[in-house]
Structure formats: structure tokens, C-alpha cells
Swiss-Prot record:
Family, as annotated: Belongs to the RNA polymerase beta chain family.
Tissue specificity: Mostly expressed in seedlings, flowers and roots, present ubiquitously, except in sperm cells.
Sorted UniProt keywords: DNA-directed RNA polymerase, Magnesium, Metal-binding, Nucleotidyltransferase, Nucleus, Transcription, Transcription regulation, Transferase, Zinc, Zinc-finger
Any one Pfam family match given in the protein's UniProt record, by short name: RNA_pol_Rpb2_6
Listed name of the protein: DNA-directed RNA polymerases IV and V subunit 2
One Gene Ontology term, aspect cellular component: RNA polymerase complex
Catalytic activity: RNA(n) + a ribonucleoside 5'-triphosphate = RNA(n+1) + diphosphate
Residues annotated as transmembrane: none
Length: 1172
């Protein structure tokens, strides 16, 4: 069926009609075409990195203001130094932050404001940042004691606040790095003007430029706050609030203070503010008046005798620690005593502690008591086996932290540091008699600026829960090998764990990952399963700004009673983002009304609604960090009756309920069809439907053709390694970039096949390689296993030819820099007669001219001092190239720096690595002349010959299917009934919906080829027809960055380590080749002892030492005078006082060094020697 579109107006008219339509009337082809258009609309709206941009934009618009407002009014007291102020007339001050404004990124040069773009920061080694200004109010006052009328006020004296001065001004508080393409970035506007300004054509932003380097946030998986965490080792239920990170824990444990025969009874205790309190005492401190009332709040409906005994034992424990706690405020007084007796007691009163730190989302103490009873009931139900414990590996219990949350936490830490410095500085002036200086004199703007820059540079960020700790792995360098690697880095997630401890099941896939996290894209090694990649349709929710509580009441929610007497039997709890906000009588109709209004955009589109029938709860989430994904709503697919062709945006699909964004908890109640085919078989049993199964994969897996036919490990290698190492087109603006190392393919091509993901994304740059004619054959034995043989003529015509651009950077201090140095010690750029290298290509300014051919030993950047000291940068061993560009500039730190880029053309040579898109990585083993290659009847000569043994062991039949499909696509097919009309077929190789083998073979047959892709070929050397047929077809191959020219190592003699006398390791320092344990074991297995002795001894650190055979100790070589009177030098045993039994042995110098080090520690070794 041809593709058909839906008209928006007709769709709205159709919604008014009634009556059900059978989905089979729409047709499978129409529904699949609609899914493709819906996915395209999704990518047009959200793209692939919207989660990075949305999080940062929300932080700039709302989160940054909340950080400053959270500090409230800060009181600054004087230092109370009686030496400075003897009259004790102390002054106080209060500081309050007001409105926060963030400016656009600008750069000032000679007091001139210049336009500042990301490529300026990259070239000038600067940070692409914007200045933060905040309105600060400073109030200076005195406290004076004034007498009052005791009969009117009840006090003899009271303290009167006398205001001395009030100032308001906008000050610079620091600078914040700007995310490229965010609302602060000047390149966020779409259009071709950005490309003219130097912006890359396919740069989507989402990263930062810190001191010239591109940095990206790795999304952090953190445990969700404001949720009940039930654990069975030991039995506890905990609640962690959002603002205050102090956990509130209810523990069910054995009563340690009871007598022995009662030891098995479990009691309920509460861990609150670093102290342990019996739960019954906390109930009465919150306003519960009787034991029956507390039991009704718990409302445990089981008949388990052990739980009943635990509740009774908990009452007895409360009676034991506090007598008469049911009377008056005795329970509250006991709680206050316990809190004040902790090591670090809070400054607030007990009432304030209960209000601020105990369930801060609930305002009254009665509601807090109800929530406490709800926690106790959940714990007891879990202990009785009626409720499951929480799974920490499930994404329902996690939130994704992105740029907004990470920057908010880091800025809060540095702002607190700046506040402490401000307080200490203001205290000194408040104690004196002089006026206070302007507030910018006390608030150091460099604290936030330098703190954020240090966090980005080092990668150490504030821990989410522990104040004094830092975590790593939050920020990473953005990969620029090709656009696909850039997208992978921007969609990566990470779970922070301690590798030394037990990780548990964190590395294994979880059912909650389905459709949100790619189940193949994960690295190997210690990060396996911990570093993940989001799936194509995975979307991270943002914080909802609109209040939904009133709308919940309109949908039938009842208000939570502010008492502890009214029973809640038959009512279902309604939790909004973890806070208990109300009740509902009929949860089924209430949830149905909520979903209906959400599908009509009366409620936030990203709202998640979960109905828990087992626990009688309705959980609603509108917070940020949840992983959502779009699904088709089956009951609304009847609106898609075929109408006139037209296009519509993704928002329209959400507004009319055809699609909806489903969260992890809500999807547990959905019955989702895997595809249109499965849906059409039984449409009545499904509530939702997938757009396509290939969207379950990540961006790197979804573009692999026939991925479902390959071994999972091979797809993992392609998605996690090969596609990120493939040489393509990294950017469209290489002339204004000075990356340390970049690769560019001369003639990148797009493959003949298509996948649904690449077609919906409209990104041909996701493929980095060329289409090569590949033959599966054994050729001269040079393509054993993974080796390949390539056509030399194809390489000479430019196949897989690339260029490598390496930049060398150096910086010097400007002459007018603040760092005072002697003129003869000031390093400057310039040409000097260097002793460390050749300066033939340098000009007088110390830089080479454009087009200069430089090789090993040449000076690439000349630097010297007035005294003649040489600080030049020299090309190391194997480094060479032609000078492409020279950049000289200065940054905002007063330093001049230069960058010289060398270009080197790389044509494939022996040892280079290539890979297909199926994980078939091979090393180029031989370059064969074209006339010696086998050729077909049509005269087609293959570009690459691979060994047939590479397929059974690696289990990649997908490559064979790709070659057969591409062969049919590339060749014209004659239409039936026409002798001259030809057309080209384009077929999709989308994973899980690929064409069948029969369909591919019929396509080859219609094109005039063998059904199974085999070709009759002739020997290029003899011209004879070969007996066996060879499978041949076009296959998309990638050239990897692993090239033999960068890895080949050779040396005869060279530098050795001064301590161990072994060859150094660095290749550029003429280092040796590593001979490790695996190589040693291999030679041992072959019995090549002479070769082993040569490698590990003769060619490494051969040495000799002397041993006394009598005392078996080490003999020294000393100069001594024997009885003859003439001095001689030789080995001598100091223990035996003789040289008669001394022999010479050959040992590695590393062993000799070990003996000497042990001897220096007082450890003597005995050696047994034997004459050979």
C-alpha cells in the first residue's frame, strides 16, 4: 500500500463521530507508514539531545534563581573584638539575594564588548561562559535594649532593631559555562547564518567549551528521593526528602534490651536526626492521643501473631524509656532531649525540626502522623510477605541527573563557600567604626567561576548525598572521530558504584530497561553494564511548572483529613511526586479520568500515572529525570481513517491521544504489542503498540543492517567500538578548529541499504565508510581468519584514503602580564639556533610557513628567552606532515598561545584495520594488483577479499544478507511488461523487520544474478575459469583509526630506563616492543627456549653478577691489595674473605636490582649455583 498522510482538519472532524472501526480496515501498510511518520515527527520535535538542552535551559530559567533564594536572609554578626570597639555598641548586617540575571556570552578586549561564539572559545583556549549578576540587599542595623511597660507587654525590656543603612545593587557573582545551542548560546537560532559564522552544519550542541576543550555531561543514574525504600537486610523502610538529604528510617529489629527469652521479639524504632526513637513515642509527639488511634493509623489488616507481638513489644519499649509518655507533652519532650543529645544537634527547636526535616512535603503534624503510620504499615506488609521490597536496579526507582541538577548542586557548594568568605570579611568591618565597603568587595566572584572550571577540568563533582566527597565520571571529553560518536557520548548514562564492593545485579539488564536503554550498547571491562546508552525513543522528563493539585481535585480526588481519628477504610491514597496529597474512593475511574484529560492536554503530557491495586495507591509523577517513551494508543487508532494526504506535528498526536508518553511505572499496567503485525492479529487484548522494534535499540545499534541476524557480541562490538573508531567527516568547519588529532575521510559514502532509524532521523552522517565490492574467497593465504586482501588499484583511485590532522600547541606569558618575571626569563615565540632540532622551516616569528614539509626532529614551534634558553617544541619520532594552518591568539588569562596543524595523507597500508557494520574487524594483510584478482563475467573485480572462515566463528550472516540485498539494490531491474523502463529498488535492512531470504533471492534473480549471490569468476593470473563459484556483493566497510603507521615499532638499540636498564615503553622515544605474559606463555608452549632467552634476557637487560659458591652470598667487585702488594680489582667474597669460590652468573639486571634493594633492607639472599 502506498504511503498516506493524515489531514489535521479531517482528523478533528472524525473525532466528533462515533462508532468503532476495525483496525484491519486501515491496513498494515497504512499503519506502518503512519508509525514511520510519527517517529519522524518525534525526532523533529525532540531530536536526540533534547534531554541535555532542556535540563540546562530549565536550570538557567528557574533553577539558578532557586539556588540563590534557598539561602534566604543571611545574618552576619560582628567578631565581638573588644579591642576594636570598647563601647560594645555592636553592628549587625543581613544579606539577601534577589533577582538573578544571566547575560549572553561576551568577550571584552580593550574595554570593548565583542561577539563571543563557541568557535572563538575553541580557538582561543577560553571557556564559553556567561556572567551571572544578582541583586543583593545589605542591611546594617543595631540591637538596642529598650525599657517597656510591663503591664502592657509583659516584659521589662525588649530588643529594638535600629536600621543604620540599607543598600541594593546588582553585582557580578561569577560566570557559568554556557551549553552550546542552549537559550544562552548565540548559535541557538536555526538557519544557515550559523554555518557562515563557523558553526558545524550537523552540530546539535549539548556540550560545553572549557578552556578550548569540548566537555559533555554523562547522565547520572541516582536513587529517587521522596519514595519509600523497603529493605529486608535488615528490615527497614526509609524515606529521603528532596530538599533535606537526611533519611528518615523505620526499623523492625530485635529488642536488644529485652531479656533473653524475649530476645526474638521484634520492635519498631525510628532513626531521625542521628538518634533512635521508639516509633510509639514519635506517634504521640505528632499529636496521637491513644494507642488505639495509633493502631488505626497503621491499619494493619493481617492476622499474623508475630506482627501483633511486635506492635505490643514496641508499646512496652516506649513505656520503658519514657514513663507516662501519653500524658501532656512528655513524648515531645523526650524527642527533644534525644535530638539535643546528639553529637551535632540542630540549632532549631523540636517543633521546627519536625516541620523542616520530617516529611517536609506535609505541613501539619497530623498528616505527618498519618504518613508515619503508612510507612509502618508498608514495612509490616513486606515483613508478612504481602508487599515486595524495592529493587534498586529498576529504573522506576531511579532518576536521571543531567546538566541542570549537577550544576545546581555544584553551584550551591561554591556559593556556600563564597558566603563563608563574605561573612569572615564583613565581620572585621562590622567590629570597627568605619562604613561597610560595597558588597562586591566581600563577595568573591572568582569562587564560583574557578570552582566550576575546576570541576569541568578535573571531572570531580560534588557527591549527591555526602557533602565532603567528590565523584568522578560526571564529565567527559566529547568524542569527535565522527558524528555518530558525538551522539553516543551525548546519550550516555552512568551508574555510580564502588567497584571494590558488591555490585549485585546492577550490571545485568532489567525489564525496566525495555525501550528506554539499549540492551546492547555497553562497554566491556569494569564499566560493563554500568555505562549505558539511551534508546532512540528514550526521553528524559523535565520538571512540570504548572500545579496539578487543583486539577486532581477536579478529577475526583478528596482532600486528606487533617486529623488522626477519621478512618480511611476503602479509600485509596493519592501520592504526587512522593507526597500524600489526597484520597480517592474509586481509583479505577479516577485514573481513567486522569488519562483522558492528559490525552486532551488538560494535564501535563509528561505526567506519569500509576494505579497500584495491591497497595491501594495512585502514584502520580511530574518531576524531572524520569525516562519516558512514546507508544501508540490502540483505542484511539480508529481516528486514523484514511483521509487526504497532509503532515502534522508530534504535538498534535499527543493532543488527540493517538500517541502518549509512557513512564516506567505506568507501562507496568499496559499490554503493549510488539508491532503492527502482532496488533492486527488480536487488537482487543492490547492497550498500546510499539512504533517499531528497532527503536528499542540505541542510535549506534539501530543503524546496523540485519542486526537481528548477527551474534549479539558482534553487534556490541560495532555499536560500542567500531562505529566510534570509524573515520568519517567529523565536522564541516575543520578550518577553524585546532583539535589535537582529527581524521577525515576523503570520499565518505552512504550505504546502499536503509534503516528505519536513519531514514526517520534524516542523518546520513551516521554512516562513516564506503561501499566496497567484497568477495568471500581464500586468496594466497594472506586473509587468514580476520585478515583481508585489498585491490591495490582501488586504493590508488582513492578508496579509503584519509587525512590526519595533528595540532601542536604552545603558550607564553604576555609581556604586560601581571606575573612579574625578569626579561631574560620571559619565554617568547621566536626563531633561535636550536640544539634539539632543525629550524629550517621556521620563519623569524618562530612558526613554520604554510605548506612546509616537516619530519622527525624538526622544530614546529620556536620558543626562547632573552638569555638564550631553548623551549621549542620538536616533532618526535614518526611524526611528520605538511603545515596546514598556523593560529596565533591570546585568551582572557593574559597568555599568548599558538597552534600549528600538520596534515598527513594516509592511504591504506599493511596492518591497517577495517570493519564492516557487523563487527567483522579485519587487518589488511596483502595488497594485490588488480590484474591478479579474480573477475566476473561482467568484468567486475572485487575491492576486498575476505576469508569464508570468518563467518562461522563470528556468526555474522547479516553481512552476507547485506551484500545480497545491496547487490540487488545497485543493479537495475527490468519492469514486467516493459523493455526499456528500469528502476532502482531501495529496501530497508531495519533490525527485526528485515526482508526475508526468499524476497532477497527473488530480487537477485530478477536482476539476472544467481539467487544466492554466487558469481562465476576467472583467475586473474591464468585467465582460466575457476571451478568454484564465489559469493560477491557490495558491502559497507569502515576504515578505523587503528593504523599501522601509528603503531609500528622498531629499534636496534635505544634509550633504556636509568633504574632497571630495560628499554623504555614510549614508541615516540624509540621504546621497545612489549613482551608480556601471553607472549611468554606462547613461546613456552612451543618449546622455543632459545628465542625466549633472547627476548627476555639478551635483548632486554642482560647483566652479570658474582656469587660465592661456598657461602652462597653475593660477592662484590672491589679493589684490594693481596699479599703480593700490588692492587687488583675483581670479585671478592667479604664473608669467606676469599675469591677462590667466586663464580660469575648472567642474570637480568631487574633481578640484580631486586637483590640489592632487599639487601638495603637487611634481607640477605642465598644463591645455589651449578656448573652447566
Amino acid at each position: 500500500m502506498p504511503d498516506m498522510d493524515i489531514d489535521v482538519k479531517d482528523l478533528e472532524e472524525f473525532e466528533a463521530t462515533t462508532g468503532e472501526i476495525n483496525l484491519s480496515e486501515l491496513g498494515e501498510g497504512f499503519l506502518q507508514s503512519f508509525c514511520k511518520k510519527a517517529a519522524t515527527s518525534f525526532f523533529d520535535k525532540y531530536g536526540l539531545i533534547s534531554h541535555q538542552l532542556n535540563s540546562y535551559n530549565y536550570f538557567i530559567e528557574h533553577g539558578l534563581q532557586n539556588v540563590f533564594q534557598s539561602f534566604g536572609e543571611m545574618l552576619v554578626e560582628p567578631s565581638f573584638d573588644v579591642v576594636k570597639k570598647k563601647d560594645n555598641d555592636w553592628r549587625y548586617a543581613t544579606v539577601k539575594f534577589g533577582e538573578v540575571t544571566v547575560e549572553k556570552p561576551t568577550f571584552f578586549s580593550d574595554d570593548k564588548e565583542l561577539e563571543f561564539l563557541p568557535w572563538h572559545a575553541r580557538l582561543q583556549n577560553m571557556t564559553y561562559s556567561a556572567r551571572i549578576k544578582v541583586n543583593v540587599q545589605v542591611e546594617v542595623f543595631k540591637n538596642t535594649v529598650v525599657k517597656s511597660d510591663k503591664f502592657k507587654t509583659g516584659q521589662d525590656n525588649y530588643v529594638e532593631k535600629k536600621i543604620l543603612d540599607v543598600k541594593k545593587q546588582d553585582i557580578l557573582i561569577g560566570s557559568i559555562p554556557v551549553m552550546v545551542k542552549s537559550i544562552l548560546c548565540k548559535t541557538s537560532e536555526k538557519g544557515k547564518e550559523n554555518c557562515k559564522k563557523g558553526d558545524c552544519a550537523f552540530d546539535q550542541g549539548g556540550y560545553f567549551v572549557i578552556k578550548g576543550a569540548e566537555k559533555v555531561f554523562i547522565a547520572q543514574e541516582q536513587m529517587c528521593t521522596k519514595r519509600l525504600w523497603i529493605s529486608n537486610s535488615p528490615w527497614t523502610v526509609s524515606f529521603r526528602s528532596e530538599n533535606k538529604r537526611n533519611r528518615f528510617i523505620v526499623r523492625l529489629s530485635e529488642n536488644e534490651k529485652a531479656e533473653d527469652y524475649k530476645r526474638r521479639e521484634k520492635v519498631l524504632t525510628v532513626y531521625f536526626l542521628s538518634t533512635e526513637i521508639p516509633v510509639w513515642l514519635l506517634f504521640f509527639a505528632l499529636g496521637v492521643s491513644s494507642d488505639k488511634e495509633a493502631m488505626d493509623l497503621i491499619a494493619f489488616d493481617g492476622d499474623d501473631a508475630s506482627i501483633t507481638n511486635s506492635l505490643i513489644a514496641s508499646i512496652h519499649v516506649a513505656d520503658a524509656v519514657c514513663e507516662a509518655f501519653r500524658c501532656g507533652n512528655n513524648a515531645l519532650t523526650y524527642v527533644e532531649q534525644q535530638i539535643k543529645s546528639t553529637k551535632f544537634p540542630p540549632a532549631e527547636s523540636v517543633d521546627e525540626c519536625l516541620h523542616l526535616y520530617l516529611f517536609p512535603g506535609l505541613q501539619s503534624l497530623k498528616k505527618k502522623a498519618r504518613f508515619l503510620g503508612y510507612m509502618v504499615k508498608c514495612l509490616l506488609n513486606s515483613y508478612a510477605g504481602k508487599r515486595k521490597c524495592e529493587n534498586r536496579d529498576s529504573f522506576r526507582n531511579k532518576r536521571i541527573e543531567l546538566a541542570g541538577e549537577l550544576l545546581e548542586r555544584e553551584i550551591r557548594v561554591h556559593l556556600a563557600h563564597a558566603r563563608r568568605k563574605m561573612t569572615r570579611a564583613m565581620q572585621k568591618h562590622l567590629s570597627g567604626d568605619g562604613d561597610l565597603k560595597p558588597i562586591e568587595h566581600y563577595l568573591d566572584a572568582s569562587v564560583i567561576t574557578n570552582g566550576l572550571s575546576r570541576a569541568f577540568s578535573t571531572g570531580a563533582w560534588s557527591h549527591p548525598f555526602r557533602k565532603m566527597e567528590r565523584v568522578s565520571g560526571v564529565v567527559a571529553n566529547l568524542g569527535r572521530a565522527n558524528p555518530l560518536q558525538t551522539l553516543i557520548d551525548l546519550r550516555r548514562t552512568r551508574q555510580q558504584v564502588l567497584y571494590t564492593g558488591k555490585v549485585g545485579d546492577a550490571r545485568y539488564p532489567h525489564p525496566s530497561h525495555w525501550g528506554r536503554v539499549c540492551f546492547l550498547s555497553t562497554p566491556d571491562g569494569e564499566n560493563c553494564g554500568l555505562v549505558k546508552n539511551m534508546s532512540l525513543l528514550g526521553l528524559v522528563s523535565t520538571q512540570s511548572l504548572e500545579s496539578v493539585v487543583e486539577k486532581l481535585f477536579a478529577c475526583g480526588m478528596e482532600e486528606l483529613m487533617d486529623d488522626t481519628c477519621t478512618p480511611l477504610f476503602g479509600k485509596h491514597k493519592v501520592l504526587l511526586n512522593g507526597d500524600w496529597v489526597g484520597l480517592c474512593a474509586d481509583s479505577e475511574s479516577f485514573v481513567a479520568e486522569l488519562k483522558s484529560r492528559r490525552r486532551q492536554s488538560e494535564l501535563p503530557r509528561e505526567m506519569e500515572i500509576k494505579r497500584d491495586k495491591d497497595d491501594n495507591e495512585v502514584r502520580i509523577f511530574t518531576d524531572a529525570g524520569r525516562l519516558l517513551r512514546p507508544l501508540l494508543v490502540v483505542e484511539n487508532l480508529q481516528k486514523l481513517k484514511q483521509e487526504k494526504p497532509s503532515q502534522y506535528p508530534f504535538d498534535h498526536l499527543l493532543d488527540h491521544g493517538i500517541l502518549e508518553l509512557i513512564g516506567i511505572e505506568e507501562e507496568e499496567d499496559c499490554n503493549t504489542a510488539w508491532g503492527i503485525k502482532q496488533l492486527l492479529k488480536e487488537p482487543k487484548i492490547y492497550t498500546h503498540c510499539e512504533l517499531d522494534l528497532s527503536f528499542l535499540l540505541g542510535v549506534s545499534c539501530a543503524v546496523v543492517p540485519f542486526a537481528n541476524h548477527d551474534h549479539g557480541r558482534r553487534v556490541l562490538y560495532q555499536s560500542q567500538k567500531h562505529c566510534q573508531q570509524a573515520i568519517g567527516f567529523s565536522s564541516t568547519n575543520p578550518n577553524i578548529r585546532c583539535d589535537t588529532l582529527s581524521q577525515q575521510l576523503f570520499y565518505p559514502q552512504k550505504p546502499l541499504f536503509k534503516t528505519l532509524a536513519s531514514e526517520c532521523l534524516k542523518k546520513e552522517v551516521l554512516f562513516n565508510g564506503q561501499n566496497a565490492i567484497v568477495a568471500v574467497n581464500v586468496h594466497l593465504g594472506y586473509n587468514q581468519e580476520d585478515s583481508i586482501v585489498m585491490n591495490k588499484a582501488s586504493l590508488e583511485r582513492g578508496m579509503f584514503r584519509s587525512e590526519q590532522i595533528r595540532s601542536y600547541k604552545a603558550e607564553v606569558d604576555a609581556k604586560d602580564s601581571e606575573k612579574r618575571k625578569k626579561m631574560d626569563e620571559l619565554v617568547q615565540f621566536g626563531k633561535t639556533h636550536s640544539k634539539i632540532g632543525k629550524v629550517d622551516s621556521l620563519e623569524d616569528d618562530g612558526f613554520p610557513f604554510i605548506g612546509a614539509n616537516m619530519s622527525t626532529g624538526d622544530i614546529v614551534i620556536g620558543r626562547c628567552t632573552e638569555s638564550g634558553a631553548d623551549h621549542s617544541i620538536k616533532l618526535k619520532h614518526t611524526e611528520r606532515g605538511i603545515v596546514q594552518k598556523v593560529v596565533l591568539s591570546s585568551n582572557d588569562e593574559g597568555k599568548n598561545f599558538a597552534a600549528v596543524s600538520l596534515r598527513q595523507v594516509r592511504s591504506p597500508c599493511l596492518g591497517d584495520k577495517f570493519s564492516s557494520m557487523h563487527g567483522q574487524k579485519g587487518v589488511l594483510g596483502y595488497l594485490e594488483e588488480q590484474q591478479n584478482f579474480p573477475f566476473t563475467i561482467q568484468g567486475i573485480v572485487p575491492d576486498i577479499v575476505i576469508n569464508p572462515h570468518a563467518f562461522p566463528s563470528r556468526q555474522t550472516p547479516g553481512q552476507l544478507l547485506e551484500a545480497a540485498l545491496s547487490k540487488g539494490i545497485a543493479c537495475p531491474i527490468q519492469k514486467e511488461g516493459s523493455s526499456a523502463a528500469y528502476t532502482k529498488l531501495t529496501r530497508h535492512a531495519t533490525p527485526f523487520s528485515t526482508p526475508g531470504v526468499t524476497e532477497i533471492t527473488e530480487q537477485l534473480h530478477r536482476a539476472g544474478f544467481s539467487r544466492w549471490g554466487n558469481e562465476r569468476v576467472y583467475n586473474g593470473r591464468s585467465g582460466e575459469m575457476m571451478r568454484s563459484m564465489i559469493f560477491m556483493g557490495p558491502t559497507f566497510y569502515q576504515r578505523l583509526v587503528h593504523m599501522s603507521e601509528d603503531k609500528v615499532k622498531f629499534r636496534n638499540t635505544g634509550p633504556v630506563h636509568p633504574l632497571t636498564r630495560q628499554p623504555v615503553a614510549d614508541r615516540k622515544r624509540f621504546g621497545g616492543i612489549k613482551f608480556g605474559e601471553m607472549e611468554r606463555d606462547c613461546l613456552i608452549a612451543h618449546g622455543a627456549s632459545a628465542n625466549l632467552h633472547e627476548r627476555l634476557f639478551t635483548l632486554s637487560d642482560s647483566s652479570q653478577m658474582h656469587i660465592c659458591r661456598k657461602c652462597k652470598t653475593y660477592a662484590n667487585v672491589i679493589e684490594r691489595t693481596p699479599s703480593s702488594g700490588r692492587k687488583i680489582r675483581g670479585p671478592y667474597c667479604r664473608v669467606c674473605v676469599s675469591s677462590d669460590h667466586v663464580v660469575r652468573v648472567y642474570v637480568p639486571y631487574g633481578a640484580k636490582l631486586l637483590c640489592q634493594e632487599l639487601f638495603s633492607m637487611g634481607i640477605t639472599l642465598n644463591f645455589d649455583t651449578k656448573l652447566c
